[in-house]
Amino acid sequence: MNSKLVLLVVGVVFALVLVIGRQGGVVAPQSISVSPQMSTAAPVAAPIAFPQATNVAMAVEPMAAAGGTVAAMESPLPNFVPRNLKVFEGHWQGMDGRLMTEELARKLNYPRGVQGVLLGEVTLNAAFSGLLGGDVVVRIDDTPVTNMENFQAATRNVANRSEARISVIRKDNRPGTPVLRKLTVVLRAAEGGLGFAQLEGAPMILPGDPRPHGYRGACTDCHPVGQGFELSPDPDLISLPPSAITRDAVTRGVSPHEVRGPCEACHVIN
């Protein structure tokens, strides 16, 4: 009888222990094993901002890789901006000009030895004066023009004047042997003087960019290397979606442009 009573008491105690454990009883400290690596909180890396344009190399903190080893994050190269870049083009009173080189002469069928500033485009006062794209500026008043630097110097001489004589070489566009004519036009400014030419370098290129032209020496003779010096994307290459039109306009076939397909292909129809 006593043995049965002992067994009954033991069973009740065991059951109470199980119930207390399931309801969140206190667990002995010895039952928890804490790893030394877990006891120290890992430092949280601060976010790293990479500005698009910088000339200073940026230090980057190493980050722990998934396997536990420390791997250095690759930092972007800083922009490379040479101090002495060749002048690429100049702008003055609506002229967009660049140095006439032997390469350009061959491409555009000009005789060898022509020196001056080749006008790629003319607008504003340059167009009103009679200049054309393809003209080669060889003299401004009495100052010869053989490169971009003395083109700017020649314009400085007339900057405060309201007019100047521009001598150019113009090539006949008929096929065959090029025929050149020398012309002199008068460039006039309505007010404020003619000012002087502004010179610019070649645009920035990305590291490793393929060369789009023949060899002209080291890329860094003309170009900064990196990103951030040009607006990207070019807004002129972005097409905005057409405005919404009414269903009535579609039904009546009212269109402000020629037929380009179903209206719903481009327009939201309300």
From Swiss-Prot:
Cofactor comment: Binds 2 heme groups via the magnetochrome (MCR) motifs.
Lumenal side: 21-270
Keyword hit for Oxidoreductase: yes
Induction: Part of the probable 17 gene mamAB operon.
A Pfam family this chain is assigned to: MCR
Post-translational modification: Subject to proteolytic cleavage which requires both MamE and MamO.
TM annotation in the entry: 7-20
Compartments, record wording: Cell inner membrane
Positions of the UniProt region annotated as PDZ: 84-201
Effect of deleting the gene: Intermediate magnetic response, few large magnetosomes with magnetite, makes many very small, irregular hematite crystals. Near wild-type localization of MamC. Deletion of approximately 80 kb of DNA, including this operon, leads to cells that are non-magnetic, lack internal membrane systems, grow poorly, have reduced mobility and take-up and accumulate iron poorly.
Membrane topology, record value: Single-pass membrane protein
Superkingdom classification of source: Bacteria
Keyword Plastid: no
Role played: Involved in redox-control of magnetite formation. Oxidizes Fe(2+) at alkaline pH; successively forms ferrihydrite (Fe(3+)(2)O(3) 0.5 H(2)O) then magnetite (Fe(3)O(4)) from an Fe(2+) solution.
Comment text on domains: The dimer forms a pocket of about 8 X 15 Angstroms, lined with acidic residues, which may bind 2 Fe(2+) ions.
Remaining remarks: This bacteria makes up to 60 cubo-octahedral magnetosomes of about 45 nm in diameter which contain membrane-bound crystals of magnetite (Fe(3)O(4)). Expression of just the minimal mamAB gene cluster (MGMSRv2__2365 to MGMSRv2__2381), including this gene, is sufficient to form a minimal magnetosome chain with small magnetite particles.
Name by which UniProt lists this protein: Multi-heme protein MamP
Species of the source: Magnetospirillum gryphiswaldense (strain DSM 6361 / JCM 21280 / NBRC 15271 / MSR-1)
Name of the gene: mamP
